[in-house]
A protein has these predicted regions:
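Active-site-lining helix/loop region of Rossmann-like oxidoreductase modules
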Residues: 56-119
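Rossmann-fold NAD(P)-binding glycine/threonine-rich loop
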Residues: 1-52
Length: 119
């Protein structure tokens, strides 16, 4: 999730989440299989930029999570939706996909996104 106070209401814990909002969600629901993905692009980009597998202009969507099986499942979904999935590692790495992260609201190839989140 991306925390937006005007939409989500005031939540100081989410507003100051040093490891990202999805880590807070995982802590609140410890038995959930939380994967942060499909949040770095807006709905219009998801609609406009999906491409078939192998297309040279296919863009990447990151997936972060501590449950590796759940991450793989989400990555398969991302691929079926028409994007190149990029495993960005544990859930705390999903912070890079949030509004202050450089991949947010930008289109990158899988290689470019991998390099951005590896920093």
């Amino acid at each position: 999730m991306n925390y937006w106070e005007p939409v989500d209401g005031e939540d100081p814990e989410l507003a100051t989440a040093a490891d990202g909002t999805s880590v807070v969600v995982q802590e609140r629901f410890p038995s959930a299989r939380v994967v942060k993905s499909l949040n770095q692009l807006g709905y219009h980009e998801l609609d406009e930029h999906h491409r078939p597998n192998g297309a040279p202009d296919r863009i990447a969507v990151g997936a972060a999570g501590d449950d590796r099986l759940a991450v793989r499942e989400v990555m398969r979904l991302v691929d079926r939706l028409g994007f190149d999935p990029v495993d960005v590692g544990p859930l705390e790495n999903g912070l890079a996909l949030e509004p202050d992260g450089s991949p947010f609201a930008a289109t990158y190839t899988a290689d470019e996104l991998s390099r951005l989140v590896a920093r």
